[in-house]
Amino acid sequence: MKSGIRNLTEGKIFSTLIRLALPLMGTSFLQMAYTLMAMSWVGRLGTTSHPEIATKSEAAIGAIGLLLWLTSSVAYLAMIGSEVAVGQSIGAKKMKRATVYASHSTTIAIVLSIIWVLILFTFAQPILSFFKLEADITADAVLYLRILTISLPFQFLSYNFTGIYNGAGRSIVPFRNNAAGLVLNMILDPILMFWMDMGLHGAAVGTVAAQLFVFSLFLYQVKFGSRILGNFKFFIKPKAIYLKRILFLGTPVSVMNSLYAIINMNLARIASIHGGHLGMMAQTTGGQIEAVTWNTSQGFSTALSAFVAQNYAANKIERGKKAYIYTIRVMLTLGVAVSICFILFGAQIFGIIVPEENAMKAGAEYLFVMGLVQIFMMFELTTQGMFNGIGRTIEPAVISITFNALRIPLAYYLASQMGVTGVWWAIAISTVCKGIILPTWFAIVYRRIKKKNPKPKVG
């Protein structure tokens, strides 16, 4: 290991991929565990005489969760750009260029975060009114969001540092930092919400404290610890050639995920119109439960992106293809197991988070439909990592944006015929389409790459 990086172009493929993916998956599962635990605490805010307090609070958290999803998607611009640009520079043995890319992506993250905070803080009320929730739920959500804006610049920087470390093959560092932050958040939530009697907004304060803590860990490691890439500068006057490359790599993924978040905001609005706050709660809380497969797939996708970036630059694309095959096998096994649990035990699983009869019934309907299509979702996300690694981020963006956008008119139509369940079926139908088309498209792209370079290095 040199300059805090790891060479992914040598060694056994599966073990190398697993060592890279496990910390990423660990971070994802810790994030999922925290989110579900936070929702579980919120789900217990109600009383026997007023159980609606819990479901209304969950709806408020759900609305905020969608905006945080959009926030993460915006932050992906710098994160993905740095991950691929740094990874490819390292694979090509051009360390100075990797350092320059790290400085540029960090500068982008700082500027983006300031703009985003100003937008969310200033327009919190009209943004959250979009979901058509009751006035008291919207008011709670507005205060919650404004508290969270304190931590967003630090969250953007942490995402950026995560991309840099992933590109350098050091995914264990973000895992440790995020794990520490999540553990702190888990401890703070019940203390702030119940012991200090801050209720729903105690969760927001806990999140702010945890994000500041995670950033401080990254800052220490970059400046005084591993000093990755020679202690690169955080804020510079950007040069067009590097800025363009990062934007080229990061923008499609960022736009894709941002549009995905916006589309889900529209779906939540439709669910709220046809199912009230219970409909929105079922979608947003159910989506967090569904994160067991989403986060696992995203972890492997990110690992593949870093793995393939280095091997593609080193003319060892066949190593990346083999890693993809291994990952698909893992996804298939996990997808079947999760689908069975969602289909057969949806109500019981949902009841762990919100132990209220109406909430359990609504949640079970959502998980049943989603359980039918988990494998297709995992195939799509895994294949995205392959495209990102070879620097072709546009293809998965086109497919994802197209079929996710089709969810809105389909949801309006099906909801008018079937009620709120029609929204779930609109999501499921588009998921199947993406899970079939994207891997097929990659197979075509891979054959073209092989024709251009018929004798790649095996490694």
What are these regions (language model features)?
Residues E58-L118, Q155-P174, M280-I340, L344-F345, ...:
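Small-residue-rich hydrophobic transmembrane alpha-helices
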Residues G46-L66, D136-L143, I241-I246, G276-H277, ...:
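Periplasmic/extracellular loop-to-transmembrane helix junction in inner-membrane transport proteins
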Residues L8-S40, R44-T48, L66-G81, A85, ...:
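N-terminal transmembrane alpha-helices
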Residues Q31, T35-A38, V42, S72-M79, ...:
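Alpha-helical transmembrane segments and their lipid-water interface positions
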Residues M79, E83, I147-N166, P174-L182, ...:
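Short runs within selected transmembrane alpha-helices of multi-pass transporters and secretion channels
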